[in-house]
Amino acid sequence: MTAEDSIAAMSSSSAAGSSAKVPEGVAGAPNEAALLALMERTGYSMVQENGQRKYGGPPPGWEGPHPQRGCEVFVGKIPRDVYEDELVPVFEAVGRIYELRLMMDFDGKNRGYAFVMYCHKHEAKRAVRELNNYEIRPGRLLGVCCSVDNCRLFIGGIPKMKKREEILEEIAKVTEGVLDVIVYASAADKMKNRGFAFVEYESHRAAAMARRKLMPGRIQLWGHQIAVDWAEPEIDVDEDVMETVKILYVRNLMIETTEDTIKKSFGQFNPGCVERVKKIRDYAFVHFTSREDAVHAMNNLNGTELEGSCLEVTLAKPVDKEQYSRYQKAARGGGAAEAAQQPSYVYSCDPYTLAYYGYPYNALIGPNRDYFVKAGSIRGRGRGAAGNRAPGPRGSYLGGYSAGRGIYSRYHEGKGKQQEKGYELVPNLEIPTVNPVAIKPGTVAIPAIGAQYSMFPAAPAPKMIEDGKIHTVEHMISPIAVQPDPASAAAAAAAAAAAAAAVIPTVSTPPPFQGRPITPVYTVAPNVQRIPTAGIYGASYVPFAAPATATIATLQKNAAAAAAVYGGYAGYIPQAFPAAAIQVPIPDVYQTY
């Protein structure tokens, strides 16, 4: 080997080594050089997996546990050609980045959104406050908001006799990362659960893996099929706001427990400290005059028994006024929010108790959520108990129970609108209904056919219900139910023809076009000679005003009677129901003017 060959081999090996250091997802990227320069400057690693490119996680020199919940923000409306080399300098200006996950597409471009996790919660809040609507490109603004790191699963189909310890042990056998199990006791029988539980996991990834493993049809618990879905995430309230709360949320009460009993129990430490108590089924809100009294009562009564039931007492979580107004505006379909009708914040309740007892859901939850929240103003996939969404503030007592319109907004929204009136088929006819749809008499009249054509007199509709019944029997049921005598069919046909000839005059010369009456219409079979007639009506023509005889003959399939009615003309095809007029395709029509 010559010196030149050795130098070439060394250069090729060094080039191969340098290319091997480029991580997957960065090699071949449109801005590969810029990404490599970013990694060299910050010392963060970068790798692509599961359709996302991770920058950091953890950062270099990190020691300690994973950042707590609330440290991650969601970044949306990212231009498709913007990558980490432009995003990192913007977001690291407000705090130290623990991890940045940019969602990638197959073509190498981003999918328009990313997740940025900071080392501390206050840094994430600062990012939302300062970087929302940040102009990353001319005319392109970023959307930054707090990310919901949901670590809780809803599991239904649990036997009601199982205890919390049994459920925790069984779930821990089939999934990993289980931290806690929340089980709600039945209000009627405290020895039973409500058939569902909430499982808390150590991370969102662990919860997602458990959800995939527990999907229906894969695993059975205690020999039962289970239902698994994401639980409604807990409301993350600012710590400064929680420091001002002086309302306690008390759950696991007995149904028989009264508000006076609760007020007496919570006011025993300082007489007169309880302003009011509102109880709904097995939970209640206790309002105090001061926060100190509320905290003191919570510390002393949490876990104690009241009338044989173990109480769970916590501070009520408020919803800020701005969010409440935004929800109200969305529920009204984008209308302007009314000025300060509500207090500074409304207090949420136990959504699972509300869902269990089937209270009417307010405008932001329940089966009519899509009707009240117009244009998709509020979105989300989280679920609460039994697949129901957690209650929001609209139409509820402090976010707790229905306080007015609620699900009945359809009725209120329908007021004041002009309703279409029905046709007055039978005036003053009262019809007993078996459904909520009522038939209302209106003022719109249907013109009678006899007013235009005198040869077809329209029978007036009877106004009494008994006469209506008789009219129905005579003109609808009789032609089908009566069995005619074949021997008298010819006589009946002759009588009908005579009556028709007596009622309808024969006209030799038609009147002018404007006064021309309706001419008879004959349906003629193909290849059959037409009927010659001298007048406007044939001798055997049977008007629609008296169709009973022809109908009976047709329904009974009596060819002789049918031929007798229509003058023995075999080519005539009678209608089975002449009252419906001629609506079928007619091969040939013969009209005489």
Curated annotation (Swiss-Prot):
GO CC, any one term: nucleus
Example GO BP: RNA splicing
Matching Pfam families: RRM_1 (PF00076)
Subunit note: Homodimer. Interacts with A1CF. Interacts with APOBEC1; form an mRNA editing complex. Interacts with RBPMS.
RNA-binding among keywords: yes
InterPro entries per the UniProt record, alphabetical: HnRNP_R/Q_splicing_fac, Nucleotide-bd_a/b_plait_sf, RBD_domain_sf, RBM47_RRM1, RBM47_RRM2, RBM47_RRM3, RRM_dom
Asymmetric dimethylarginine carried by residues: R394, R405
Biased composition (Low complexity): 1-20
Family of the protein in this entry: Belongs to the RRM RBM47 family.
Functional note: Single-stranded RNA-binding protein that functions in a variety of RNA processes, including alternative splicing, RNA stabilization, and RNA editing. Functions as an enzyme-substrate adapter for the cytidine deaminase APOBEC1. With APOBEC1 forms an mRNA editing complex involved into cytidine to uridine editing of a variety of mRNA molecules. Through the binding of their 3'UTR, also stabilizes a variety of mRNAs and regulates the expression of genes such as the interferon alpha/beta receptor and interleukin-10. Also involved in the alternative splicing of several genes including TJP1.
Free-text comment on this protein's domains from its UniProt entry: The RRM domains are required for mRNA stabilization.
Stretch list, region Disordered: 1-24
Subcellular location: Nucleus; Cytoplasm
Main location: nucleus
Domain called RRM: residue spans: 71-149, 151-233, 246-318
Name listed for the protein in its UniProt record: RNA-binding protein 47
Family annotation (CDD domains): RRM1_RBM47, RRM2_RBM47, RRM3_RBM47
GO MF entries: RNA binding
Residues annotated with Omega-N-methylarginine modification: R332, R394, R405
Keywords: Cytoplasm, Methylation, mRNA processing, mRNA splicing, Nucleus, Repeat, RNA-binding
Species name: Pongo abelii (Sumatran orangutan)
